[in-house]
Amino acid sequence: MQMVPSLPPASECAGEEKRVGTRTVFVGNHPVSETEAYIAQRFCDNRIVSSKYTLWNFLPKNLFEQFRRIANFYFLIIFLVQVTVDTPTSPVTSGLPLFFVITVTAIKQGYEDCLRHRADNEVNKSTVYIIENAKRVRKESEKIKVGDVVEVQADETFPCDLILLSSCTTDGTCYVTTASLDGESNCKTHYAVRDTIALCTAESIDTLRAAIECEQPQPDLYKFVGRINIYSNSLEAVARSLGPENLLLKGATLKNTEKIYGVAVYTGMETKMALNYQGKSQKRSAVEKSINAFLIVYLFILLTKAAVCTTLKYVWQSTPYNDEPWYNQKTQKERETLKVLKMFTDFLSFMVLFNFIIPVSMYVTVEMQKFLGSFFISWDKDFYDEEINEGALVNTSDLNEELGQVDYVFTDKTGTLTENSMEFIECCIDGHKYKGVTQEVDGLSQTDGTLTYFDKVDKNREELFLRALCLCHTVEIKTNDAVDGATESAELTYISSSPDEIALVKGAKRYGFTFLGNRNGYMRVENQRKEIEEYELLHTLNFDAVRRRMSVIVKTQEGDILLFCKGADSAVFPRVQNHEIELTKVHVERNAMDGYRTLCVAFKEIAPDDYERINRQLIEAKMALQDREEKMEKVFDDIETNMNLIGATAVEDKLQDQAAETIEALHAAGLKVWVLTGDKMETAKSTCYACRLFQTNTELLELTTKTIEESERKEDRLHELLIEYRKKLLHEFPKSTRSFKKAWTEHQEYGLIIDGSTLSLILNSSQDSSSNNYKSIFLQICMKCTAVLCCRMAPLQKAQIVRMVKNLKGSPITLSIGDGANDVSMILESHVGIGIKGKEGRQAARNSDYSVPKFKHLKKLLLAHGHLYYVRIAHLVQYFFYKNLCFILPQFLYQFFCGFSQQPLYDAAYLTMYNICFTSLPILAYSLLEQHINIDTLTSDPRLYMKISGNAMLQLGPFLYWTFLAAFEGTVFFFGTYFLFQTASLEENGKVYGNWTFGTIVFTVLVFTVTLKLALDTRFWTWINHFVIWGSLAFYVFFSFFWGGIIWPFLKQQRMYFVFAQMLSSVSTWLAIILLIFISLFPEILLIVLKNVRRRSARRNLSCRRASDSLSARPSVRPLLLRTFSDESNVL
């Protein structure tokens, strides 16, 4: 009996990814021998827990997570200082805003977690049927244990990860959809091992005695390694290998199959679906980094203000009679307090007084803006694709503004730039090109050059080639007829994860060889004579991105064993006899230059003795539980040698609609586009010309195997080419200007082509003096090229390219877009990852930050949505710091007139409500709805994108502009009111207002000015903007009347009683408020007027030039200010 390996403690059961070793699962939880003791297994139960909190740990855990944010922790410290130290303001002023922010966030997270709890309970309490003692037993899903045999009916979801034992079909197959896991809606076929196919009843399945050895849980949906040991009465184990085709994943749905039986191998939080709950590594946008930098600057300003006021307080008190009057002598405790300690206490008090310069509510507003703003992408009807009946999807809202800051775009070719809708065009057999089909069934239409004729070229070779196309694939067949087997009259539907394979099978069908499907391990083919041929499928050597080929080993009805192989020319040519290559190579290169996807086809006969050895090696490799993939790859390499080349195929993959226009727009926007593909150079190069990545006047620089192999020493030749190309580019671009994007149109354009083997040579070059800087020189060349094509790239090489560019000086923002599993690595590596909802599965879309149906949607996503998102959030950030500096500066200036006594200028209610109620909604509405430029203009004039690149609106210049504007306005608020107070004319009875009235006037001017400033900046008015802007001002007035019109019993001092009403009873106060608001906004209004005059003048000159010039010219690009202040017409 096989013993259960040592298990981790129960606390480590869920979500552990870094486990080593294997686990043993006993089918039905029965021992394999009745005579030996059964050791109970310890695995996780089948409960799914996607929630973060429980009822008892929600409060401490949520608070801990929220106070890890620096701003929240800072305000907590301020609040504690107010509670413990005698500060000038009430703890409520900082405690209430902090409480509001914490409460809103906690409610949001608690509600989301409540929904997760509800969803978990629906899954955990669902009904399942377990086979126990040959009977169907009804249980709740959460009570499934590892080893239980589960019965699943049609259209039901698998409750855990199961190994398929049997199904209602005679061949032990079942159809599954995994739409809830990876978004793929097409049916996939899964298989049971042949020894358990017949066990299709509860009674028979209960007699099975077997043990499954498999890897520990890991999150990859497409990988599984295991074996099943089946014990007969003689206790002789029969071992069968298990792979992903035998594993039914939790969350997938059974389709077109009445029922199946499977044994649970992974349950609960160890299922692949649960392990995939964990999010991808957190990506931070450039705006977030700018916010942190601004916080540091304003924290420095805060500390400086507190230090200055503390110092000046003691300087002022050092003057005789300034410290204390004779009637207010110090107490004994105050006299005994150390002066240093008193100074430190005063310093803390000033920090509390000025702490509102740090915007605590900004984080909440930014989060709401990102979350709500992401819906505009999902709601955009232009992203809807009728073919797949889907639109765009936002997987993360944290990177919306990053879409407006992209410098480099890395794109896949197949399925991204092209349709991935393959059509068989032609083939080449033994160096002869065949195109089209004749009415004769005994020959193909052969064309060489311009001459078209029919020739009986070795009939056996033709049929061998077509049989290879019909047999060497993983295509599955679905017939609309439910009769026994496919017939000529039945309508065949081919299903495969690879559109190439479907195109080849359909191409063979055009020439008279029809693939009829796989039944009980036999592949059935109808030949040109309408005869049914059967081939026993012995082994499938699956395709992978490293090998770039796939093979099958079949046995004919005559008993011959054949290996058919198809793959890229670079993967097949080295494995066939050299004298067979040249004729076929000519056609392959010609087809590649025409933009077709090419595959080479080869075969070899395997002697029975050789097959016995091969079969033994394959079984041993498939049975391995450790390093199975590496062992199988080694066996595949040994098998796929000394083959005979038959021919090659050419498949057309049409360019996607508007792909060329999209790339042109990206180039015009200043973005550098790189194509990273696994295709051969000629095919990719042709596609790049077709999609206008390369222009006719683009000079191409090649770093490929072909150019490197001109020399005996590859590294020497590589070094020569790198130096040559760098000199040429440095001569063309003598200075590395900051605006190198504009230089593209002023100099000769260059494009670079590099293949995977040359890239490996660059990255892994020997560390001698001549080659240790290959990478640096290569990057210098790349930066000077307008476009780069990387062909023959492995998935990891794509990620290496992205990582190299990310680490360039200046940290350019990278975006990767692709549609297949081989693009996932570069999508995860880049700053922004975009997945195409393509025909090669949804792995790319599932691992991306955003997913769109087509490549053409990238244009609007970046040029319109990205532009607007960046402008909105950049304005939001600058505005928050601006309005808080306006808020605090009068408080700071007031200390010079109150003996630095820490006397607040504003009432505590105003301190509390300023950021929460009076000024928060207008900027939130602006940051969601603002369109400073029309969307059609943004997409039609890509050059506008360059105006905001490089995080332009959050650089030092705009930051200083907003800071000085706030300083100017804050000074006007305070000193304007102060000088108006010099006369007694503000009140009719000649009395002068008190300090609370003074502060209320300043605060009123402040609220109206910062709100009207936002109104001046708004270019796109909606009813929501009107409501929140004028509504906020009305609410402030109403609140002030309400707050000052009632004697509140919970207040010790009624400071504000009747202050606001008395203030507005004076006509002079009204005039003063209006005058100060106008003076504060006058620079803004003046700038608007000047910009409008300049705009009208520019339009008039442009009209004159157009009238005098017969050639149509594009409209000049209107410069976008580094702040969002408008030179467009204003509704206001």
UniProtKB/Swiss-Prot annotation:
Its job: Catalytic component of a P4-ATPase flippase complex which catalyzes the hydrolysis of ATP coupled to the transport of aminophospholipids, phosphatidylserines (PS) and phosphatidylethanolamines (PE), from the outer to the inner leaflet of the plasma membrane. Major PS-flippase in immune cell subsets. In erythrocyte plasma membrane, it is required to maintain PS in the inner leaflet preventing its exposure on the surface.
Motif extent (Di-leucine motif): 1116-1121
Main location: membrane
Reaction equations catalysed: ATP + H2O + phospholipidSide 1 = ADP + phosphate + phospholipidSide 2; a 1,2-diacyl-sn-glycero-3-phospho-L-serine(out) + ATP + H2O = a 1,2-diacyl-sn-glycero-3-phospho-L-serine(in) + ADP + phosphate + H(+); a 1,2-diacyl-sn-glycero-3-phosphoethanolamine(out) + ATP + H2O = a 1,2-diacyl-sn-glycero-3-phosphoethanolamine(in) + ADP + phosphate + H(+)
Residues in compartment: Cytoplasmic: 1-66, 108-290, 368-879, 930-955, 1017-1026, 1091-1132
UniProt name for this protein: Phospholipid-transporting ATPase IG
Lineage: superkingdom: Eukaryota
Effect of N884A: Decreases ATPase flippase activity
Phosphoserine modifications at: S445, S1108, S1116, S1126
Record text on subunit structure and interactions: Component of a P4-ATPase flippase complex which consists of a catalytic alpha subunit ATP11C and an accessory beta subunit TMEM30A.
Effect caused by changing N355A: Impairs ATPase flippase activity
Recorded coiled-coil stretches: none
Mutation effect (K883A): Decreases ATPase flippase activity
Effect of D412N: Impairs endoplasmic reticulum to plasma membrane trafficking
GO cellular component: early endosome membrane; endoplasmic reticulum; endoplasmic reticulum membrane; lysosomal membrane; phospholipid-translocating ATPase complex; plasma membrane; recycling endosome; recycling endosome membrane
Binding site for Mg(2+): D412, T414, D819, D823
Active site: D412
Effect of L353F: Decreases ATPase activity
Annotated consequence of substituting V352F: Impairs ATPase flippase activity
Protein's GO biological process: monoatomic ion transmembrane transport; phospholipid translocation
Keywords: ATP-binding, Cell membrane, Disease variant, Endoplasmic reticulum, Endosome, Hereditary hemolytic anemia, Lipid transport, Magnesium, Membrane, Metal-binding, Nucleotide-binding, Phosphoprotein, Translocase, Transmembrane, Transmembrane helix, Transport
Reported tissue expression: Widely expressed.
Regulation: The flippase activity is inactivated by caspase-mediated cleavage in apoptotic cells, allowing for PS exposure on the cell surface and engulfment of apoptotic cells by macrophages. The ATPase activity is up-regulated by aminophospholipids PS and PE and down-regulated by Increasing intracellular Ca2+ levels.
Cofactor(s) the protein requires to work: Mg(2+)
